[in-house]
Amino acid sequence: FPYTTLFRSWQSPDYSTLVIARMLTGLAHGVFFSIGSTIATSLVPKEKAASAIAIMFGGLTVALVTGVPLGTFIGQHFGWRETFLAVSLLGVIALVASLLLVPSSIPGRASASLSDQVKVLTHPRLLLIYAVTALGYGGVFTAFTFLAPMMQELAGFSPGAVSWILLGYGISVAIGNIWGGKLADKHGAVPALKFIFAALVALLMIFQFTASMQYAALVTVLVMGIFAFGNVPGLQVYVVQKAERYTPNAVDVASGLNIAAFNIGIALGSVIGGLVVEHVGLTQTPWIGAVIVLIAFLLIGLSGRLDKPARVALG
């Protein structure tokens, strides 16, 4: 990550090189979070696995909240190349911290064989969870991608106020991330996810009606932020649990594919949102996002029901 950011992004001679460097950086990003999830769960008792994942992803949400304004500040005052230089230095700090702070006694996993990796890609129970992840985030990002113009054009906030609203949304996301982990630890992944998805469906439908009412829209967005990423810990710990059961030799691969499903959902939501804005209008994105999240809610309910025979058999 520091190498691709420092020597490829910072010193990019042209735009094409910069794009390639960012793609390589994205590969490192996906690997980090897939392995990080399994490391986080291995450091704590099983009943605290979701909270451990929440703390790890909490770092991502804090970075998103603080990194965007800091990156903008550096770019405006020193130049865009210096922004990448600063990011690469942070990457070096993270590398050193990992070497010093992550225990070396964590038991390693055997490398997944090709057949194990294929099983991860084809096992219906894992594919079901990937679909839940992609649809859950696709629905949220159908509306969130256009949150700034909605708050400005529909709710009537100034551009400066919208920046503060997005910061507040990010803080809500960070809070929801930790809360979601505790919820999954206490009640189990499936009940927690069903509750969070149901709340997101309701909040997106409420936002459909409050988007044009300034203060009501603000409250809806801030509350929605708590639930938007609250499902991350539950989804990640759930896919790890299912992978340990169905593909025990490829848990890291399954974890990584769930991270890929997150990103697919974000891309999917952005595309759907763009099509909605182009053909139907900006005001219609919340309810369409709610329908997509509703499908995720139904699928996680189905996955939970499929778990029950296994529990009976084990008992």
Short names for language-model regions:
Residues R245-V280:
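A late C-terminal transmembrane helix in Major Facilitator Superfamily
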Residues N177-G188, V277:
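Helix-to-loop junctions at the C-terminal end of transmembrane segments
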Residues S88-P107, I300-S303:
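C-terminal membrane-cytosol helix-exit motif in multi-pass small-molecule transporters
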Residues P13-T25, Y215-V223:
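Paired small-residue
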Residues Y15, A21-G59:
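Cytoplasmic helix-loop-helix junction between adjacent transmembrane helices
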Residues W10-T17, G156, G188, T210-A211:
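Helix-breaking motifs and short loop linkers at transmembrane-helix boundaries and internal kinks
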